[in-house]
Amino acid sequence: MLFTIALVGVVLGLAYSLHIKIFSYWKRKGVPHETPLPIVGNMRGIVKKYHFRDINQRIYKKFKGQGPIAGMYMFFKRTALITDLDFIKQVMIKDFSYFQDRGAFTNPRDDPLTGHLFALEGEEWRAMRHKLTPVFTSGKIKQMSKVIVDVGLRLGDAMDKAVKEAKVEEGNVEIKDLCARFTTDVIGSCAFGLECNSLQDPSAEFRQKGREIFTRRRHSTLVQSFIFTNARLARKLRIKVLPDDLTQFFMSTVKNTVDYRLKNGIKRNDFIEQMIELRAEDQEAAKKGQGIDLSHGLTLEQMAAQAFVFFVAGFETSSSTMSLCLYELALQPDIQQRLREEIESVLANVDGGELNYDVLAQMTYLDQVLSETLRKHPLLPHLIRETTKDYQIPNSDIVLDKGILALIPVHNIHHDPEIYPEPEKFDPSRFDPEEVKNRHPMAYLPFGDGPRNCIGLRFGKIQAKIGLVSLLRRFKFSVSNRTDVPLIFSKKSFLLTTNDGIYLKVERV
């Protein structure tokens, strides 16, 4: 009995000592920081009372100007919130070799779809990035844009149908789901080579599965937050994050698609085809004894993981950007009309008035409107980089130890009045060429920057632009009695999303 009591005392003592060591880190470093609470650190109220961007804002506002970083604790994870734009450039570009990992959760052994490019680390990430970069060249995006334009036509038809049905509700149309169905059909075709038909059928299987990725959780939101802020510990515990049936759905979809194409000699200009070709190149090189390490090659599981993240990142981010853009344009009819006039003017000089990849480059105001949407509504509240070795902050005595997270508070930078006066105002002129030239390059980071920026940023922007043009050339958007002004955003979702649908009054032009 006494031995048991003594053992419990020793364990509790060790736990207390470890707790003190972790939560005194920034104090010992002499870095300004908020006093942490036991276990949760500075995450008190997360997902219930606060979103990540709210906690980041509190710390950013309190400590900006006191040094390049402010210390915080994301549960047990020691995190440096960066408040200095020059130091952000050091982390993301100049000293990238110290910060090449994201510290994101990945557990391919137990949860194969988490072995995707966004989360991979070190040489695994470098090898996969090298393989996938050719998939997202301008030439490849141009080929895929033809599919996106076709889906855009169906989007216009689906909106036309929604407008007819909405007459009984004073023209109210819920645009958030419609935009998500558009991007689901685009990604389904461009990534998997499948006709999802969710624009015609809102209950289509791919649309349902896409929705479930964000609405179904294997764990509570609090546990999810812990997993994603303590990724390595979660991996050691062999935790999974995706429901098994969703994993099985995407794994079988990729396997069946690959098997069918190889068996029947079918080729398409899509993401799956590019990965099939990359896999074949690896196998051919290995046969010739060129030293290709197939453990870094594209196994079926790796192919499924890359297709999965392409689907998740491609449909949710672009659809949210589109719906938020239309919302802002509904509030600013003059901006909406100027954009529509640009669209009509450019397309008037195209044979048949047909939209294509090349004419999008002529729509400069569209680019400004989209950029301002992503400035005001960045879909990720922050970017994370993890120190892969000890790093001394330039012109400072502060050394960030290996494993410390560096947090770039994107949302808070985008809403800093010293960088963007009247940050809550939607103003595309912020992205006039001269304005952009005079602004710090790290003041705008919707897609990150440096070697680990978003590999699919060009695809995402083209998809959103084609969707917006397809709608704005045919329809006018305005606020209605069901439009939330301001919008109410979810505190539970890591990505920026509204609690409810976005309702606008929609009329034919």
Swiss-Prot record:
Belongs to the cytochrome P450 family. This is Probable cytochrome P450 6a14. Its EC number is 1.14.-.-. GO terms for molecular function: heme binding; iron ion binding; monooxygenase activity; oxidoreductase activity, acting on paired donors, with incorporation or reduction of molecular oxygen. Heme binds at C454. It comes from the Eukaryota. It is an enzyme of class 1 (oxidoreductase). It is found in: Endoplasmic reticulum membrane; Microsome membrane. Disulfide bonds: none annotated.
